[in-house]
């Protein structure tokens, strides 16, 4: 059964797609950087007390590898290089795309915690109208 993604998920994905419409790919790359960065940091924090659930621990270990850390460093270096090569307008767009993605990452985790669905969003709107 297909369930529509929650509005937060839709909004985050739409944000990323919009950045790829920009002529400067640095803007799109800046919008992508927060996701692996956050997952890596979160994985390291969660691994301080390993999970007794093997499946969950495997998920954690996916995000704490040296390979992922190296990949993130390379992505960060690329984004920084593209930032240096950009004009002031695009630099501002890169910062905005990065910050919006950081915000959307937080909303994405909140969405999962709250078990948000498109239907629950609509129900919340209906309650606000009353």
Language-model features: locations:
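An amphipathic alpha-helical core segment
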Residues: 32-107
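Acidic, carboxylate-rich catalytic segments that either coordinate divalent cations
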Residues: 94-130
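Long, hydrophobic, amphipathic alpha-helical segments used as structural scaffolds
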Residues: 20, 24, 43-50, 109-116
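Short, small-residue-biased leader/transition segments that mark boundaries at the very start
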Residues: 1-2
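Acidic/His metal-coordination segments adjacent to aromatic residues that form catalytic metal sites
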Residues: 9-28, 56-59, 86-91
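Aromatic-enriched hydrophobic runs in primary sequence
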Residues: 10-16, 36-38, 44, 123-124
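Secondary-structure transition/capping residues
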Residues: 27, 47, 86, 116, ...
């Amino acid at each position: 059964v297909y369930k529509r993604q929650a509005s937060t998920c839709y909004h985050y994905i739409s944000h990323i797609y919009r950045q790829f419409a920009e002529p400067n790919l640095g803007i799109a790359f800046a919008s992508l950087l927060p996701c692996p960065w956050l997952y890596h940091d979160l994985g390291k924090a969660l691994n301080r007390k390993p999970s007794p659930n093997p499946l969950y621990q495997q998920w954690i270990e996916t995000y704490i590898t040296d390979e992922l850390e190296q990949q993130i460093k390379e992505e960060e270096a690329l984004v920084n290089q593209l930032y240096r090569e950009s004009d002031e307008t695009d630099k501002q767009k890169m910062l905005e795309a990065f910050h919006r993605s950081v915000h959307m990452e937080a909303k994405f985790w909140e969405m999962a915690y709250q078990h948000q669905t498109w239907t629950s969003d609509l129900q919340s709107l209906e309650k606000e109208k009353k």
